[in-house]
Structure formats: C-alpha cells, structure tokens
Amino acid sequence: MKLIEKVFYTNAKLPEQFLDICLPDCDSFPVYVYLHGGGLTRKDPIAERTEPRKISGFTEYLVNHGVAVVLVEYRCYPDACYPEFILDAAYAVAWVKEHMSEYGNVTGLFVGGASAGGYLTQMLCFDKKYLGKHGIDPDSITGYIMDAGQPTTHFNVLKERGIDSRRVIVDEAAPLYHVCAGRDYPPMQIIVAENDMRNRFEQTQLLISTLKHLGTDESKIDYRFMPGYKHCEYGKYADENGDNILGKVYYDFISKF
C-alpha cells in the first residue's frame, strides 16, 4: 500500500480542504472517495500531523482488496455554513476525477460516506448543481454509497437556521427534495442500522420508497440493513474471520461494478 497525504483539492488550500490517497499494490483499481461523518461539525481545528495517518478498518480492508481509497476532509461547523461542506465535497470529487489517473488505471469512481458524509453523498447524487459546477454529471459516477446519511435537511443545518434540529424538513437542503423521475441514477448502496439514531431508519425507508415510487431501477438499489448495531457502529467491528464488517459491505458493492 502507498499513502499520499494532505493533497489540497482547491487552489485556496484552506486547512480543511485536503485529502489523503491510499493506493493498493496494483496498477488498475476502482476508486472510493470517502466523506467522513461527525454531524458536519469539528470541535477543534485540524492539527498538523506529526506521524503518518494510521490506515485501519474499512480503509485497510478495501486497499488490501485492490480498491484505492481517498479520504476527504472538508469545512465543518463552526467554521463553515451551509452549503460550504457540500461545495467542498464536490471539489474533492472533481479533483479525484481529474487527477487519479496520474496514480494508475482507474476502473471506476465511487463516492460515499457515513452519517454526515452520507448526507453529503446524497446531496452530490441527487442535486445535480454541485457536481455540475465542475462539468460532472452526477449520473456518470460509477456508484454511490450512502451509509446512514440523513435524506431530510440535516439536523445541524436546521440548527444553523435556528430551527429545532429534531424537526423533519424537506427543502432544497434535503437530498429527498431533489429525487426525481426521469434520471438514470447510478447504482447506490444504502445502509442503515437496526438501532440507528432517532428517525434515521424511517427516513432511510422514505428515501428508498421515494426512489422506487419515482421509477428508479430497483436493481440499482443495494439496501443493507445492519441488525443489532447502533448508528455506524458496524464500522468498528470485525467478523469471525477478522475482516472489517463495513469494509466487506462496501467491497461487496464496489466489486459488482
């Protein structure tokens, strides 16, 4: 494995706008652009690293199975406001699409994330304007992984507006608002835990139901229900063979395309 750290994906080179590239030991590979979770918030500024990033969990599993993983940092509250984190996510995807061929033969481009990263992924997929600003049709992405993302307006976006963050609102800041008929959506993996955070399971079911109601090819929806787990908890555990559970779920989807 080869690790390339702190590559800035905008000309502004703001402290939060960088990515780390984890390359497998092969010349051809699919690429998974991963957007981390955390409620779109960051308590402390990103500190300068004194040691290389530790690669473990799903990232290690994917790289060991021939998938390049790009780990994206982006602006968060309290130093950002809507929609800056979505704009950053789009910039990162555009950088990867333009530059990853410099590192090997790219066989597919997947975009995904967990929790807040799942929300960002949904916004990139369903609201065409964000990737469109970079000349990218979101339907040209090989596949999307929406891991426990909120398809309604994100609770911290509501908080920014001074609205009770428990409310369920679907407006232009909600991925669901942009789901429509007539698009040939790429394959998407949608993941939710049995004991996920309040309302996340129900909102996920509404997203899936809406996609189907609007005529989305159901064979492109890879729904994964994670029994017994809490919100994104499955990323921390290994199976009986010692393999990261989330890594296997991601790889099962990526390897199909």
Ranges and model annotations:
Residues 91-159, 171:
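Primarily recognizes the serine-hydrolase "nucleophile elbow" in alpha/beta-hydrolase
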Residues 205, 213-257:
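C-terminal catalytic histidine-bearing segment of alpha/beta-hydrolase fold enzymes
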Residues 25-61:
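Short, surface-exposed "cap/lid" segments of acyl-processing enzymes
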Residues 32-37, 71, 95, 190:
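Structural cue for short, hydrophobic secondary-structure segments
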Residues 116, 194-197, 228-230:
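Acidic beta-to-alpha connecting loop that harbors the catalytic carboxylate
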Residues 135-143, 148-161, 166-205, 209:
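The feature captures the conserved acid-bearing segment of alpha/beta-hydrolase catalytic domains
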Residues 49-54, 58, 68-108, 239-240:
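Catalytic nucleophile-loop/oxyanion-hole region of alpha/beta-hydrolase
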Residues 1-27:
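N-terminal cap/lid segment of alpha/beta-hydrolase-fold proteins
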